[in-house]
């Protein structure tokens, strides 16, 4: 059995653990045809063996503990997979929601749960991974290993020690003039916008029910990739999605709060893995930035996209180095003190919580699962969310389709309200792309 310390991101997601809003990362694939139960369970075991953090559990800690530790079991303590059948798409939605809404314990290994859903027209493999154990990119990598093992194809691992890189070392950062200018600009913009709080989405059909609902929509990728505004402004697909989310949130507030919103903020997770292994390693290697727009910057879809693209371009130029350095500078001490501070900060800082979160895993190409044994027809992903934000958007694309998941707290919206917001989001995206 191995033992390794948490990195600062693992700790943050542990401190944010709320059983009524579990910090689960949703990742799932649908295939053409049916999975064999026993063969898939065996493939899951092979994949867990490939990735140490997928077999991790939290070592019990005391008030004097200075660093949380992961215990890496040679063999997982429990079988994470269950098998169910779905007769309708509504059944699939319910199963998906229940899986992501059920707390995943990190005191036993593996820190995840899997559900095989038999459905006419193609089976689903759904994973719910505790965010303390992995971010979305790591979850996608684990899913890839499961599917490769099932298809009996090679699953090459990068030439690195996943437990060593898990320390989250701060990359060397020697900014040039351009990087310094962009960093200064970002800080100036942040300071200028401190005079107003982020807007929050008004509830619609909210209940006291714990957990999440998840609305799933898929769109053709080509009209988004080839959008004229994208070419004109040098924007990315992610920029278009953030812009659509920003406009949709603003319109929702205008409609349901009868007010003109000021500052709409979108949390944008950033993959801090180096380019040499950008899509590798189960674990947490993600920082985040906030894309903020004022009402003046949202007067048109073009203006909003220009503002968003300018901000994300500056973020890319600066890179993750400063954010990782800031995280590394957090004072040490007993974990009990840091846990208490994190809980206080979460409550005290609720007014500063962002309007929504949009996490994009990018495009999965054919080589991701290069086999004739399995045909992937759908991929779904969503990040966890908590009130007062209450809405987390997840995006992932294949060669020709974009899959969007809208995860909402039941304490914010009903399924009907989320469906209305999804329509608003798609309308905004259409406006940007035409």
Label the predicted regions.
Residues 158-193:
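Intrinsically disordered, low-complexity regions enriched in acidic/Ser/Thr/Pro/Gln residues
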Residues 181-235:
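Flexible, P/S/T/G-rich "lid" or insertion loops adjacent to the active sites of thioester-utilizing
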Residues 212-287, 291-293:
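Long, internal scaffold/assembly segments composed of regular secondary structure
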Residues 214-216, 280-369:
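Helical lid/core segments from catalytic subdomains that handle acyl or acyl-like groups
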């Amino acid at each position: 059995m191995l033992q390794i310390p948490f990195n600062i991101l693992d700790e943050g997601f542990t401190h944010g653990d709320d059983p009524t809003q579990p910090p689960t990362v949703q990742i799932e694939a649908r295939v053409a045809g049916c999975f064999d139960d026993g063969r898939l369970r065996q493939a899951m075991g092979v994949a867990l063996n490939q990735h140490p953090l997928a077999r991790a559990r939290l070592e019990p800690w005391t008030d004097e503990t200075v660093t949380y530790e992961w215990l890496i079991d040679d063999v997982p303590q429990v079988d994470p997979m269950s098998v169910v059948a779905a007769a309708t798409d509504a059944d699939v939605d319910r199963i998906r929601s229940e899986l992501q809404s059920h707390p995943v314990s990190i005191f036993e290994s593996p820190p995840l749960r899997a559900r095989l859903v038999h459905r006419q027209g193609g089976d689903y493999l759904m994973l719910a991974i505790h965010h303390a154990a992995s971010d979305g990119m790591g979850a996608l990598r684990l899913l890839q290993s499961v599917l490769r093992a099932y298809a009996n194809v090679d699953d090459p691992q990068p030439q690195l020690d996943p437990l060593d890189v898990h320390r989250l070392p701060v990359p060397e950062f020697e900014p040039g003039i351009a990087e310094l200018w962009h960093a200064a600009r970002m800080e100036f913009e942040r300071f200028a916008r401190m005079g107003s709080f982020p807007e929050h989405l008004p509830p619609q059909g909210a209940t006291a029910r714990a957990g999440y609902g998840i609305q799933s929509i898929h769109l053709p990728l080509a009209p988004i990739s080839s959008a004229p505004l994208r070419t004109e402004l040098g924007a990315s697909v992610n920029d278009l999605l953030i812009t659509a989310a920003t406009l949709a949130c603003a319109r929702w507030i205008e409609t349901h709060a009868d007010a003109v919103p000021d500052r709409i903020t979108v949390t944008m997770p950033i993959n801090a893995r180096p380019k040499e292994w950008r899509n590798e390693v189960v674990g947490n290697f993600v920082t985040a930035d906030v894309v903020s727009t004022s009402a003046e910057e949202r007067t048109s879809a073009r203006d909003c996209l220009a503002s968003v693209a300018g901000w994300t371009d500056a973020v890319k130029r600066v890179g993750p180095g400063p954010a990782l350095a800031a995280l590394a500078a957090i004072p040490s001490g007993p974990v009990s003190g840091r846990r208490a501070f994190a809980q206080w900060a979460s409550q005290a800082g609720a007014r500063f919580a962002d309007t929504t979160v949009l996490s994009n895993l990018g495009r999965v190409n054919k080589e991701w699962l290069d086999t004739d044994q399995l045909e992937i027809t759908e991929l779904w992903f969503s990040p966890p969310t908590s009130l007062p934000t209450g809405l987390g958007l997840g995006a992932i694309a294949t060669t020709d389709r974009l899959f969007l998941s809208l995860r909402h707290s039941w304490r914010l919206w009903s399924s009907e309200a989320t469906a209305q917001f999804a329509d608003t989001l798609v309308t905004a995206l259409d406006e940007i792309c035409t």
